[in-house]
């Protein structure tokens, strides 16, 4: 729960305040984080915060936004190393699936056992 402050771009007032220093989190919020949060909402207009959830939209781990695309769309439910239907693994809230990356950057090597390797190896 406390990590959500970081995902909402709310900065701590002091460098010493981290998610592990529980006593710092609320003091940072009350001093100026609410202004940063308001700026974030107004400037970035994050869909998952502003959009109303539909009752029929559901992710593997619960409700998500209208345009939910994958398991990693909800960063706090994505644990590093979590398998993604045998296509890849969650990493820092993202779903780096090698097949999709190789399709974009070196589509001619998709049939190889190690996609992208021939494309990036010195010849």
Curated annotation (Swiss-Prot):
SUPFAM superfamilies: Metalloproteases ('zincins'), catalytic domain (SSF55486). Expressed by the venom gland. A motif (D/ECD-tripeptide) lies at residues 71-73. The keyword Secreted applies. Zn(2+) binds at residue 12. It is found in: Secreted. Its proteolytic and hemorrhagic activities are inhibited by EDTA, but not by PMSF. Residues 6-52 form the Peptidase M12B domain. Residues 53-80 form the Disintegrin domain. The N-terminus is blocked. Ca(2+) binds at residues 48, 51. Disulfide bonds join 19-24, 59-65, 64-78, 72-90, 106-116. Monomer. Negative results: does not activate human prothrombin. The disintegrin domain belongs to the long disintegrin subfamily. This is Zinc metalloproteinase-disintegrin-like jerdohagin. It comes from Protobothrops jerdonii.
């Amino acid at each position: 729960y406390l990590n959500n402050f970081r995902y909402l771009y709310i900065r701590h007032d002091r460098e010493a305040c981290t998610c592990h220093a529980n006593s710092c989190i609320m003091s940072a919020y009350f001093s100026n984080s609410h202004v940063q949060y308001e700026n974030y909402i107004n400037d970035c207009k994050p869909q998952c915060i502003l959009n109303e959830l539909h009752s029929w939209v559901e992710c593997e781990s619960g409700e998500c936004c209208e345009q939910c695309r994958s398991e990693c769309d909800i960063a706090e439910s994505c644990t590093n190393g979590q398998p993604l239907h045998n296509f890849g693994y969650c990493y820092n809230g993202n779903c780096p699936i090698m097949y999709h990356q190789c399709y974009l950057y070196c589509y001619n090597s998709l049939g190889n056992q190690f996609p992208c390797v021939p494309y990036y190896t010195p010849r």
